[in-house]
Amino acid sequence: RGRFALVQLPERFAESMQLALKYGLQPKRLQWVHSKIDKPAWIFLMEMQKGGSYGLDVLPPLIMYNQDGSYTEQVKKFYEPAVK
């Protein structure tokens, strides 16, 4: 089964869900991304599966920056080597 990853603005969330279902894509994972913990989400990440079963896993929000402007530990992990 094919998978599709989407990065989109929050104001397009409802439209994205409608189109996914219209074309047989079942949302599987969703994560909201915030620049800082006290700021609203500026994008969302969604993984969909063609013809997949029902069930959406809503992941904890991804916070990009600490209050001092440095990357959060969560984001730093993306830049660590995969093999040590």
Regions of interest found by a model, annotated:
Residues R1-H34, K39-A41, L45-M46:
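Conserved Class I SAM-dependent methyltransferase catalytic core
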Residues A41-K84:
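SAM/dcSAM-binding transferase cores
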